[in-house]
Amino acid sequence: MKIGAMNNPRLEIGEALALFAASGFDYIDLTLEYPKAHIDVIDKKAVLAAIKASGLGVVGHTTYYLPFASPINSIRQAAIEDVIKTLGFFKEVGARTVTVHPDSGVGTIEPKTSVSLNALSFKIISDEAAKHDLTVVVENMPGIFSNVEPLNTLLTTVPALRFHLDVGHAVLRGNKFKQLLGMFKEKLVHVHFSDNRTREDDHMPIGAGNINWTEIVQALKGIGYDATITLEVFSNDPRYLVASR
């Protein structure tokens, strides 16, 4: 099992790489987001060199608020393109998976339509990712995609997709962790850990909230999970992240 951490997109990627390498993490969960880490604003050569110098592995992560379920085709296509233009770089830095985030859509659109539009978007992205030997991974999100049924529709409609289990999301407003793990254990390739009080996605240090981490870890061990776990702990004080490791 490998333990990693995610860069804060408000900071330069190099700062995260230095901290994670010095703190004994195995990889960076590299999110390419604004304001300082989007593919359009980073110095790709410098980031590539810094990753190589750090010795860290890379897991790919994309902007979490892209409108993949927009009923407006041009907006949906822009969201798709925003992910596609990251794929070559993710391949170059050694990533094998790239996380995308399903969009619950807008209230005037039926949930089943939002699910279908996400599936359409992810099929296009997945096909492009395959050209770079990358696997697209879908993360459970607050909203309609906190539930098994819509996620299952995505993963069966686009068979190449794999599952990313965010534990912090899974316990919000009704604990669905066991349900999600049981349903998607065969497709599970990536996990996020962060603590909360089960009301908001707080991204607290492990042990600071209400999540039963003994139960979580035992359940993952019980299915033989041995891949990547990212500590998605957000704080201005990096000691909280390091203490969670």
PLM features: what roles do these ranges have?
Residues 36-38, 65-68, 105-107, 142-145, ...:
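Short, small-residue-enriched loops and turns at beta-alpha junctions
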Residues 39-42, 70-75, 109-114, 175-176, ...:
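Short, solvent-exposed loop/turn segments at secondary-structure boundaries
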Residues 42-55, 120-128, 179-183, 215-220:
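Catalytic-core regions built around general acid/base machinery
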Residues 29, 59-60, 99, 137, ...:
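Conserved beta-strand positions in the central sheet of alpha/beta enzyme cores
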Residues 1-2, 9-24, 55, 145-165, ...:
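Histidine-acidic metal/acid-base catalytic patches
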Residues 11-14, 50-56, 69-162:
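Active-site acidic/histidine proton-transfer and metal-coordination neighborhood
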Residues 23-33, 59-66, 101-102:
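Short, conserved active-site loops that position catalytic residues or coordinate cofactors/metal ions
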Residues 29-52, 102-110, 201:
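Glycine-rich, proline-tolerant flexible connector loops at the mouths of alpha/beta enzymes
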